[in-house]
Structures are given as structure tokens and as C-alpha cells.
Amino acid sequence: MTFWEWLFPFGRGQENMERYTELRSGPILNTIARLEQRIMERFPESGLSKVCKEFHVLAVRSELLARNLRKPIWPVRIIAILAALLLTGLVIFAVQQLVANFSLGSEGMLQLLQSAESVVNELIFMGLAIYFLVSIEARLKRHSALKALHHLRSIAHIVDMHQLTKDPTQHVVSIVQTQSSPERKLNRAELTRYLDYCSEILSLDAKIAALFAQNVDDEVVLTAVNDLELLTQGLCGKIWQKIMILDLGE
């Protein structure tokens, strides 16, 4: 084992070991496509089928974005490097001029102190400018990832709205319907499948979001992905409570 392999054991060159330690987008997208077909076959006129169809399109776009964010944005990186080199060259030129014009004596020492103060200020400014230029690429990737995660979060809330009125107690106890009660046409088996489909969409939604955490090394993106996973877990928990009520009632 070389020094770099010891220092970075999970770096590049570990592709053969990532079959079961890295999320692969292909199987996830295939699962979403099959889930869309299953919902269309069982509930062709339902709003959930339209939600899953839109979610499939969003998942394909998000997967492509997550894959692209893994690569460097070369135009931005090249411009940032050139700008950083230009700033560095300007500071070096200023230091050379200071050294060339320096002379011994009281006036020269006073001029040296004043010039040194200016050089320190320029170095601080240059450091901030270089940090800004270097972080442009990361901030662009963060903005794109957060925008996609916002759409994935919206899908989760929409799925929750579709299962909101799916009350399992109608198959357990006798309840008198009112004029404002939502229309409930699903029998016990259909309601179980409907709720299960909602749970699957939420789980796959979190897996698509996890692709951004896997491909973008950014704390803000990782926090947003974790928040989305917690949201989908909580919504799935409510759905499975309804499924358990149906199972216990039977």
C-alpha cells in the first residue's frame, strides 16, 4: 500500500469496490419507471399516477444533474485560475517595485513601513478575492443541487396530500358519511396498494436526493438531503400506520 492509498483509502481507483457501497442511478430510475407502470395499470385515472409520471421526469433530470455536478465545471475553473494568477502577479509586481525603489535612510524606512502596510492590505484583499474565485464553482453546484432538491421536496408534499384523505378506519368501523366527507371508492385491498405506492414514491424520492449527497461534496447540500430524508421517513411512517390499521382490522 502506497502513502496516498493509506491516506485516501476511499479516493479514486476504488471503482471495483463500489458495487454495493455506492448508489447507482440506473436501478433507481428503472424502479421508478416500473412503479409508474404499476400505478397506471392499477389506478389509471388517479391523480397519483400523474404525480408518479411527473416524478419520473423529475428523477431523470435530477439524476443527470447529479451526474454532471460530479464533474468539474472547466470554464468556471479556468477563469477562476486565470483571475487568481492575475491577482498574484499584480501583488508580486507591487513587491518588486517596492524593493526596487527602497533606499536606506530615515525617509526610506518610513516609506518602507507605509508600503509594507499597503502590501499587507493587498495580501488580505488578494486572499479574499482568491477564496471567492475558488468557491464560485462550488457555489454554482450548490445552487443547482438545492433547486433540484426543492422540487423533490415538493413531490413529497404532493404525495402526502394524495394519501391524506385515504382513511383506513372506513374499513374497520362503520362511519356515517357527511355531505363534506371525501368520496372513497377504494376497497380494502386497493387502499392498501394505493398507500403502498405512496410509500414507494417517497422512498425513491429520498434515493434520488441521496445522489446529490453522493456526488456533491458540500455541507449545505448534505444538510438539505438529510432534511428531505427525514421528511420522507416521517411521511412514510404516517402511511404505514394506516396500512397497519387495515391489517389489524382484517
PLM segments and residue spans:
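Solvent-exposed, non-transmembrane helices and loops of integral membrane proteins
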Residues: 45, 143-188
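Sequence termini and other peripheral, non-core segments
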Residues: 1-29, 33, 42, 78
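Short, charged cytosolic
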Residues: 19-26, 35-63
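Alpha-helical transmembrane segments and their immediate juxtamembrane boundary regions
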Residues: 64-140
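Short, charged/polar, low-complexity loop and linker segments
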Residues: 34-39, 107, 127-136, 178-186, ...
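Cytosol-/stroma-facing membrane-proximal "stalk/adaptor" domains immediately downstream
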Residues: 207-250
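Mature extracytoplasmic or organellar-lumen-exposed domains after removal of signal/transit peptides
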Residues: 49-67, 83, 94-95, 193-209, ...
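Amphipathic alpha-helix face/heptad-repeat signature
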Residues: 24, 28, 51, 119, ...
